[in-house]
Amino acid sequence: MRAKDFLNELVVAAYRLKGGYVTIPVRGQSIAISVDHLRTLKRAKTYSVKEPDTLDWLDSFEPGSCYFDIGANIGQYSLYPAKKFGDKISVYAFEPQSNNYYALNKNIYLNGLGENILSYCVAVSGKSEFSKLYIPKFIPGGNRSQFGREDIENMKISATHVQGMFGVTLD
């Protein structure tokens, strides 16, 4: 086992002893994030500082707003507005990568937001079709997956896993 893999397993095991998640304060909201991999822990720890403009935009929602989180990953930017605004807004989270979709739903559950966020394991695309999802890092919290074709320029590395996927338009 590589040292990096061993460290990952050790950190995840330590968090499992503490319930399997970390609670992060984000602009006055206490949000639980499942720790199934070092990547999800990193996403949790950088949550409130990585995309301040996104959080500013989410803060601007008003009652009756409808939010589509396309490429929701593990759900950080679905959880925050759902927690802040509750049933005053509608949140729809779309995440095609199976590891992330599992983590997204786990985070929805940990935060008691099952009535506030509807999640869908589909790729939002320019057309509705069956195709493949090319995944460069098949880990919870992984990103840069590409639907329909392997795009090395955007993925940065070749796919380590290819997953069957249905793509949908939101028209």
Which role does the model predict for each range below?
Residues 1-118, 153-160, 164-166:
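S-adenosyl-L-methionine
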Residues 40, 140-141:
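Short, acidic Gly/Pro/Ser/Thr-rich loop/turn segments
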Residues 73, 77, 125, 144:
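Gly/Ser/Thr-rich beta-alpha loop segments that engage phosphate groups in nucleotides
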Residues 102, 130, 142-144:
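Generic domain-boundary/flexible-linker signal
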Residues 123-126, 169:
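Conserved acidic residues
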Residues 128-130, 164-167:
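Conserved sequence/structural motifs within the catalytic ATP-binding
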Residues 130-138:
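Polar, low-complexity loop segments and adjacent catalytic/binding residues used for recognizing
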Residues 141-156:
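Short, flexible, basic/aromatic active-site loop/helix in glycosyltransferases
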